[in-house]
Amino acid sequence: MEFMVNCYNKSDHKLSWEGKMMKTIRKTAIVMLLFVYFLTYGVLPQVLAAGKDTPMIVVAHRAGAKVAPENTLAALEQAIRDGAPIAEIDVQQLSDGTLIVMHDSNFKRTAGEDVCVWDTEADVLSTLEVGSTFSAAYRGEQIPTLEEMLACARGRITLMIELKYTGQEDALEESVLTLLQDYDMVDECIIGSMNKGILQKMKELEPGISTVFAFLILRR
């Protein structure tokens, strides 16, 4: 969550040193008052109260990006070996409808190819390699499909599937739910998103599915 305070001075004349100092003090005071208000009456107390009696759960972010290439089968296998109860993965849709496990909307950072996910078809995946950017030991690691991740995780670890919204999707929610049903994993997965519409749609399609709304509290 971000706060931005804009202070305007309509006067065109130059301020004295004392005037500049007072202006700075006033700005600081306003920011501090807002900060105190946030701590006292804002979201933070509600968040802390909600989590007071809730046990901590370890989630392998991007399937375990600290120990293996992010969002890969290698990372998921390591998360399982390490005993993580939940692995979070990011899912996007290719132009042909294939669901892949990928965080960025472009392959540049992880695979070195400056191509957008929505401009790519499934047959291109075999040409993309995402392991060597993490470590030479993982050279050859490829981008998995959601189906491959489900097959690997079934009965072994809960998947928190974050659905990425780019505006290029076609029946994303239906496609994901169909796969979960095919693998009988509706109860083994949690659907997450920063887009409330996606979560609402998933609940309409499958009222019993677990969902989580992802949001930023603080970003630098």
Positions of predicted regions on the chain:
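N-terminal amphipathic/hydrophobic targeting modules at extreme N-termini
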Residues: F3-V5, H13-K14
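Initiator methionine at the very start of the polypeptide chain
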Residues: M1, M21-M22
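Phosphate-group recognition and catalysis centered on beta-loop-alpha active-site segments
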Residues: N6-Y8, W17, K23-V31, F35-R220
